[in-house]
């Protein structure tokens, strides 16, 4: 398999795997353009399909972690017909090579406790590749690290991510444009919340400083109810109604 690096120069003519076209693709591409100057790297397969990796120096990552000197993987996604061919290893190897070449201490990424969860890395794959859990949030989301040097300080969650909570009653949703699916589903969830008079506060994160202080380990999509973290899984309008106890 051959891979393409998406850059500011070619992004307008290349697809980005998780969103092939339309408004979702445009929102994601604008978000990527914003971060290219901060060291974001995006590799994808030459073939059409979901096979890509996206990473950035951890100091510039839109997550509340303390990981100076590391790379942070926003997303490593290989699915459908692309699975089972070693492409995840190829993409991860490219990240490791970049980390070594730039003198990074290691690589970090989020995964779930014990099993694969939607929009998080597979913990079994990470363990197989040598990643270790270095911190755990109260909601069962782990910070995993592959170290490339010895005796270095390991990445940790900030307190706001380690103990996720909000003060508001009802539903509270934090999200960024890092995942194009939020562009499609968040407006639909807002519509049904208004239609059924469901208390919902939506916070669109537009800058790094805000993202690094979100009260959750995940910023792409973090849904709370009555102060408690519910899920990082992007909800459709029907799934959201089900969470609210409404069967449409």
Identify the residue ranges that each predicted region occupies.
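Short amphipathic alpha-helix that is part of the acyltransferase structural core
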Residues: 1-48, 160, 181, 188-192
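Conserved beta-strand in the GNAT
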Residues: 44, 48-59, 72, 77
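Conserved acetyl-CoA-binding loop-helix of GNAT-fold acetyltransferases
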Residues: 78, 84-100
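Conserved GNAT acetyl-CoA-binding A-motif
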Residues: 97-118
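Conserved active-site alpha-helix within GNAT-family acetyltransferase domains
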Residues: 113-138
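C-terminal "cap" of GNAT-fold acetyltransferases
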Residues: 138-163
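Local sequence-structure signature of Cys/Sec-based thiol-disulfide redox active-site neighborhoods
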Residues: 160-195
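Non-catalytic, surface beta->alpha helical segment in thiol-disulfide oxidoreductase systems
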Residues: 226-248
């Amino acid at each position: 398999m051959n891979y393409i690096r998406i850059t500011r120069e070619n992004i307008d003519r290349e697809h980005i795997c998780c969103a092939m076209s339309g408004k979702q693709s445009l929102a994601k591409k604008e978000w990527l353009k914003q971060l290219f100057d901060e060291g974001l790297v995006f590799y994808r397969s030459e073939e059409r399909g979901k096979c890509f990796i996206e990473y950035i120096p951890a100091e510039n990552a839109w997550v509340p972690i303390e990981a100076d000197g590391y790379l942070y993987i926003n997303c490593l996604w290989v699915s459908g017909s692309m699975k089972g061919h070693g492409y995840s290893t190829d993409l991860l190897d490219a990240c490791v090579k970049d980390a070594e070449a730039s003198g990074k201490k290691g690589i970090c990424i989020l995964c779930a406790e014990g099993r694969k969860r939607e929009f998080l890395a597979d913990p079994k794959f990470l363990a197989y590749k040598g990643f270790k859990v270095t911190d755990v949030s109260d909601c069962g989301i782990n910070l995993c690290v592959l170290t490339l040097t010895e005796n270095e300080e390991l990445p940790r969650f900030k307190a706001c991510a380690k103990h996720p909570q909000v003060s508001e009653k009802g539903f509270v949703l934090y999200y960024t444009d890092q995942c194009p699916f939020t562009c499609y589903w968040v407006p639909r969830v807002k519509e049904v919340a208004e239609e059924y008079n469901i208390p919902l506060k939506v916070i669109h994160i537009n800058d790094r400083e805000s993202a690094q202080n979100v009260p959750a380990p995940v910023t792409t999509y973090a849904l709370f109810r009555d102060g408690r973290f519910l899920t990082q899984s992007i909800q459709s309008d029907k799934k959201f109604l089900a969470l609210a106890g409404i069967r449409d």
